[in-house]
Amino acid sequence: MNIAWGWVNPLAGLRGIGLTLLAMSIFCPLTAMSQVPPRFYWKSLSGGNAVPLIVTSMTGNTNPFDASHLVTPGAEFEGTLALAGYAHTFSLFERSAMAAVLIPMGRLSGDVTTPEGRAASQSVSGFGDPTVEFNINLIGPKAQKTIPDALRYEPGFSLDVLADLAIPIGEYDSSQPLNVGQNRWYGRIGFPIVWQLGAWVPGRRTTLEFLPAVWLFGDNTDFVGETMETDPLYQIDAHLTRDFTEHLWGSLDAAWYNGAK
């Protein structure tokens, strides 16, 4: 479980650039790469833009840049991970839609064991594999095309479908097991849910949000001279968000993952 908070842009919903800053968030290592920030799937006026940012430091026995969250027994990783991106909202078939790009970057160090059983201490840094995402609403309010539409927005119960695809162009060295890039294609199909709880009044808004999803992984055919194959990974994220004031909100977050053997 983690705690996050953010600032509400008083111009949110208007055309132009809206900045969403989610800084100083504390994520457990298993959720750092794949967990989307709370309120990410709230709808806004078509033609809007946002710049999400997440920064976290962590230790554990899994590489935070690897979306499969493969646990390495006996390993100890330390890293600082930043996720920066850009999202654009638009209308498609009268439904709210969004396209986004997320770029991971940071540093990672740790003690790992190669497939041949050799122990090694490594340190890497750079850019990971960027992810592109497409999301469209299936159930919920129609796309917001005018300012009055945005002012009347209430999510009620909203259901979306999303598709992610990671592009394997991050920093990668096939001679070492620890990398920020993964040297393989992978992606996710999910169904974001936003459920409004109570009145939709700025300063009092509360939502319960879920993201059930499945990750699919291609093979890394050059992993320290071996081929790495990974089973699908099943994911459920949950966020309970609440306004503290009209311009400040917080959330309680939890995540469950299974698979990726």
Which residues does each PLM region occupy?
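Residue-level detector of the transmembrane beta-barrel scaffold of outer-membrane proteins
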Residues: A50-I54, M98-A100, E133, D160-L162, ...
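Outer membrane beta-barrel transmembrane domains
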Residues: P64, T72, N220-K261
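Outer-membrane beta-barrel channels and translocator barrels
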Residues: S46, M58, S91-E94, G106, ...
